């Protein structure tokens, strides 16, 4: 169970490949926040193959120092892990592996993101994934 303490959470909702998700479209993370009556602001942006966290912050007007990216990795044990890091930072795979007690971790392949998390690249939230994964 994830404890949510924030009064205002910004979420990224995608306009993927020209499909307008519409005003009523909700992600699992949004449904969780709605259920707990936690206010949030949904930000939308176009997703392309070159999108990164810095670009998302720039086009949505979100402050870089308060923006994070969600990275999903798999350990040598085949266990999945979710890492939430500032968008301006790069992940150190050796430190990431040590933090979860693995010999090594690697990023999951882009084609597997939706199957594993339920989200698309560029819009992966640590909240509301298909399964509950250890989150660092």
Where do the PLM segments sit?
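Extended, low-hydrophobicity, polar/charged segments
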Residues: 8-136
């Amino acid at each position: 169970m994830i404890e949510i303490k924030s009064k205002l959470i910004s979420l990224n909702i995608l306009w993927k490949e020209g499909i307008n998700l519409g005003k009523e479209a909700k992600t699992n993370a949004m449904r969780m926040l709605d259920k707990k009556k936690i206010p949030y602001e949904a930000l939308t942006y176009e997703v392309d193959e070159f999108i990164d966290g810095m670009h998302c912050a720039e086009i949505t007007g979100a402050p870089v120092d308060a923006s994070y990216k969600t990275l999903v990795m798999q350990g040598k044990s085949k266990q999945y892990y979710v890492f939430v890091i500032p968008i301006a930072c790069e992940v150190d795979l050796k430190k990431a592996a040590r933090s979860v007690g693995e010999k090594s971790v690697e990023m999951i392949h882009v084609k597997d993101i939706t199957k594993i998390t339920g989200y698309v690249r560029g819009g992966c939230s640590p909240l509301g994934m298909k399964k509950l994964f250890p989150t660092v």
